Amino acid sequence: MAAMTGLFWQSQAEDRPQWGGFHTRNMVSTETGLPTGFDLETGKNVKWSASLGGNAYGSPVIASGKVLIGANNESPRDPRNTADCAVLLCLDESDGSLIWQLAVPRIGGDDYLDWPLIGMCSAPTVEGRRAYLLTNRFEVVCLDLDGQSNGNDGPFMEEGAHMVPSDEAPLDVTATDGDIIWLTDLRSAVDMYPHDGAHASILIDGPYLYLNSGNGVDNTHKVIRKPEAPSLIVLDKETGKVVAQDGELIGPRIFHATWAPPAMGEVDGRKLVVFGGPDGVCYAFDALSSATAADPIQTLTRVWRFDCDPTAPKENVSSFLKNRKEGPSIIESMPVFVNGRVYVTVGGDIWWGKKQSWLKCIDAAKTGEITASGEIWSYPMETHCVATPAVSNGLVFITDCEGFVHCIDADTGEAYWTHEAGGEFWGSTLVADGKVYAGSRNKDFCILRASKDKELLGTVTFPAPIASTPVAANGRLYINTLETLYALEESSGK
């Protein structure tokens, strides 16, 4: 089964059906012929654009002629449903027109459970005719990639009730609504506690779905309501049943929430799942080889543990709330698994923590407690960092929250150059076609040469802030601001 899954991904090499590279999470694409410049006013190199409403923090995925991306319901696409919903849009890759949407209303009762007005933050993962997503209500859903166009497939048949608040009457399901195959509510399935916004990118390995649980603090930002909830979980792909979870008891050490999706790779013939914990520790577990929906929930076997900030406090971490000088570290980005090494960013929480972070390079072949032995190098940044690295041709590219793009030697951690873009980065870099692409929250999008010799190729100012990661697929570059998705293609438009 795993081999078949790998072949499927290889056969769709031009698509981008997962956020980041397959399993590795590396923000690198093999696409060529991508635009170096574009003009949003004249339409030069702009194939199409699509409105996302507002607060669209997620990044797109592209598969089987469709583009899937998170949006909100600020400008309702279905006039029957005007509630505050997070929305997953399925657009036609050729022209950006709407095929279907999955609208999910807020949890309600406490804004900190499901922050109002933000878009669907999680990027789906597509395999075959199925898409897997963590919704804003912390539900893992399996979706029919064709929506309702081929009928309402079960076993889940309550889409009409699911798309509206619980105190409203169900809507009739139409051809432009999403089709949920199955749904697993993590609040009941693993007894976790939601915080702010659900953020995950599901990793598929054969019959298994790996994702971070989302467990976090309550609205006081000082109490962990569910300290025993797992941080990393595994679901059966066919049924949605939880089949495994970590046993690290990370809960009491959570400073904010569990937002970092896992990565996967092999070293010395051993397949590892690598997870950046909300406690600032990077963990590696053996990948599951035998677990079914009928079995009791397994505990993942830890292979190694690397504390990215060993001198930081590990107990009573809430006492450091709003302390910008000292406190615990948290991992808020995906680890990248390349050539037997793990590259991961770690540091103070962007909202409440110390203004300090690092890019770590870890030897993935180690075992046990490897905090002292596993570090290959460490690159300090005197600010926050929530970005996932891009590792390409011996170089690592990373953005930070002070508005810098960094180019670093992948073997030694030596800095080659930095580029100041002028506004903070929440998204990651994309390396493709010999270029480094990155968009900032001050609306500027920069294009640099992917080289140890710094060369700025261009800067384009967008109409709205960018908090996502650019994506390349099928000869196009996709960039979304908080309001609009742009499909860019060389020689398109005027």
Model-predicted regions and their roles:
Residues 1-6:
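Bacterial N-terminal signal peptides
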Residues 8-494:
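Noncatalytic, solvent-exposed loop/strand surfaces
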